[in-house]
């Protein structure tokens, strides 16, 4: 209670010792656990799993009239119980390791990411992470031998990298009156695309799946610029919706597509699609909230909610008769903290977008060499080229774990390139 206004305040803190002495002297203090308002659930399981808000909200909304034991509480939370055969890790390991890995095939990504999606949705990803590391280790060999060549590979049958997406669309749709949309979901990993694909299937829509490679480092400034430039990105580019729109309009202007039939939308609604023949659309709703997710189950829940909002815009284009190409500028990966950069290390980097959780862009190659001289243990863990270095494995330059991007893990480098045509 505040004497000046008569208002009453309730403060929630992790520890009563955090309360200032003068406030504590006047306040009514009590210890409270979230389990106190979730009657009927096993308290031990609630404390054991420490579920996120989305799960707690689900439990609260499904109030019980009877008590659930530990196994029933886990099931209600969406956590897998120990005796469920679907999560026999030995069997899963055998199945995953038997997948023939073709890193240019959507079939490979679907098979691998179906296991990942199932694990994430049931909070089993930590138990499966060793398998993801194994697969990624094989992917790194592919990157070393093939990545640079993919950037200049012919786009006629399909784009192998994001800089070839627009050239492919242009070659596949030579008629200016063809209605074509590029639908970019910022930061969408392939397992998240499978969630979208399942939602489309409920509407009897079956995309033609392919994969495409993000630009490296897998950051928005470079990879999405390459998408909308239809060419290799420029370091001097300033990433914002205005410049992205400019790239989109300029690309089609050079191909003699009338400007009046071209449109670009950033995070808005699809409006009057029947007026245009080239529609560029970007939604950043996934990426904007991705970095705040404490684990992949949080990201799974976020994705479920965001895709419900995204799907109607896809349907507007579909109903307007567009051929829709759905892709992403990069994916994401759950990364483990290495450490934060110190002041000297930060001073060696470009100031704008040169250091993220998973990439470093140095002002000079000498600075890069010095960094690895001081941190020799990182040489094998990072892909180094020119003046940049990116994490190969699931680590980040942070003080705590986070979901992020910028490196060359297969979950952030391989993005969907899906085509939808109206039947």
Task: Please report, for each region that a protein language model flagged, where it lies by residue.
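…; additionally, a secondary subgroup of soluble metalloenzymes is captured
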Residues: 1-180, 187-324, 328-423
